[in-house]
Each structure stands twice: as C-alpha cells, then as structure tokens.
Amino acid sequence: MIALALPAQDSGEFTPPGINEMHLPAILPWGAAEGFSKQMLLVLLSVVFIAVFFVLAARKQQLVPGKLQFAGEAAYGFVRNGIAKDIIGGRDFIKYVPLLFSLFFFILVNNIYGAIPLIQLPTFSHVGGAYVLAGIVYFTWIAIGIKKNGLRYFKLATVPSGVPWFILPIVIPIEIISNFVVRPVTHSLRLFATMLAGHLIVMIAGSGIEYLVMQESILLKGTSVLVLAGAIAMYMLEALIMVLQAYVFTLLTAIYIEGALHADSH
C-alpha cells in the first residue's frame, strides 16, 4: 500500500494522509520530464495492456476457443450484448460498440491499478482524466443527436412532449441545466469521487495501522489487528467498486447515446 509506505510522523501524533499523497513523484529527476507524471505513464501502459491482450486473444481463432480466446470473446460479448445491444438496441447499437468497448476496458484497467501492490493508484482518482472522458462522451452524444435530428435535437432534448405550454418557462431551463450542464459534470465526478474516496479510506486505514503498531501500549498494538481486518474488507470493497464504476460509466454513455438517437420519442 502507498499508505504503508508513508513516513511515520515525528510528532508522535496520528496525521492522516491527504490529497497530496495521491500525487506520485515525477518519473525522472531534476524536472527532466516535467508535465509527464506516473499517472500519464499508467494511462499509456493501460492502452498497451488492453491492445496486447485482445490482439493475442484474437490472433489464432479456433472453433473451440482456448482460454485466452474465450476470455477475449466473453469480454467483448459482455459490452456488445450486455450494454450496447440491451440499451441502444435496434440496428444502431453495433456502430457504437467500439466506443463503449474502449471506454469500459480503459476505465477498468486504470481503476484496477488501485488494487495492484506497489502501484495502488487508480488513475481516475485524479479529476483531470475523468473530465476528459466525460467531455469526449458529452460531445459524442450531442454530435449523434445533431446528426440524427439536425439542430432540432436541442429542442427535442429541452422541450418535453406533452407538457402544458404555461409550464414550459419553468421546465425548459431545468432541462437545459440537467442535460447540458449537470449531466457531464456528474458523469465525471461520479467516477473521480468514488475512486478518490475509496483510495483515501484505504490509505487512512494503512496509516492508522502503522501508527498503532508503533505505539508502546499493548492495547493499541492489538487494536491494529481490528483496523487491519477493516482495511482488508475496504480493500476488497474498493476492488468491487473499481469494476462497477467502469460498468456504470459505460452504461450511462450508452443511455446518453440512446437518448440522442431517439430524442423524438422521449
């Protein structure tokens, strides 16, 4: 854990880790790679890992798939059938499978970094990456809506059908703020805040264990065992949340695309 690697406090008092501990040191000394952090390196490595895995899985396809081919096909089928087909449906879903597939596994791998010893840093615990992904999705579904419905899409997205005319002055501003302001912000912050909060809890638990073990009191040393048990439970819960957040982000993307494609029926 990063938390267990934090230096002990000289004051003898417990000082919980903060946001600063979420920033890993630069890759090269003396500012030689300023602006290129370890988080960026992890992002690039995630692309390599994903590409290598699926290239190897699809390289020698057989009628009776081996373990690697089966894993690749199952992963692809999960996104294709479980998200794209179920949410978007019709004949439109297939063209959006590459986007949803890339989003899911890109987020998944970068989240799983937080569960790997000695790395333990989910990339999206930094808000910048979450903003970029949410921004890509935001402009994508708007472009899809305009392509399908023309500029009339903005009317379809902000003026609900069947609403009495005298309520529209209240409803339209709410729809504009909800669809074009709140939606992209919550899409990014949901991923970022969950990863940040979960990782901070694990870091605090790790620092607490270190602090208790270093105390002279036998009672406090024994308490560290309980904290360790809680930390392991939180670690497992965080690992589950890492997978769920990749799924939720991709699922919401599919919902937004479906809404843009069928704006005239909402």
Curated annotation (Swiss-Prot):
SUPFAM superfamilies noted in UniProt: F1F0 ATP synthase subunit A
Gene3D superfamilies (UniProt xref): ATP synthase, F0 complex, subunit A
Keyword Transcription attributed: no
GO molecular function, one term: proton-transporting ATP synthase activity, rotational mechanism
Membrane topology reported for the UniProt record: Multi-pass membrane protein
Subcellular location: Cell membrane
Principal location listed in the UniProt entry: membrane
Statement: the UniProt record of this protein carries the keyword Transmembrane: yes
Transmembrane segments: 38-58, 99-119, 126-146, 162-182, 191-211, 224-244
CDD domains xref list: ATP-synt_Fo_a_6 (cd00310)
PANTHER family per UniProt: ATP SYNTHASE SUBUNIT A
Subunit-structure text: F-type ATPases have 2 components, CF(1) - the catalytic core - and CF(0) - the membrane proton channel. CF(1) has five subunits: alpha(3), beta(3), gamma(1), delta(1), epsilon(1). CF(0) has three main subunits: a(1), b(2) and c(9-12). The alpha and beta chains form an alternating ring which encloses part of the gamma chain. CF(1) is attached to CF(0) by a central stalk formed by the gamma and epsilon chains, while a peripheral stalk is formed by the delta and b chains.
NCBIfam families per UniProt: ATP_synt_6_or_A (TIGR01131)
Family label: Belongs to the ATPase A chain family.
Protein name (database record): ATP synthase subunit a
Origin species: Pseudarthrobacter chlorophenolicus (strain ATCC 700700 / DSM 12829 / CIP 107037 / JCM 12360 / KCTC 9906 / NCIMB 13794 / A6)
Gene encoding the protein: atpB
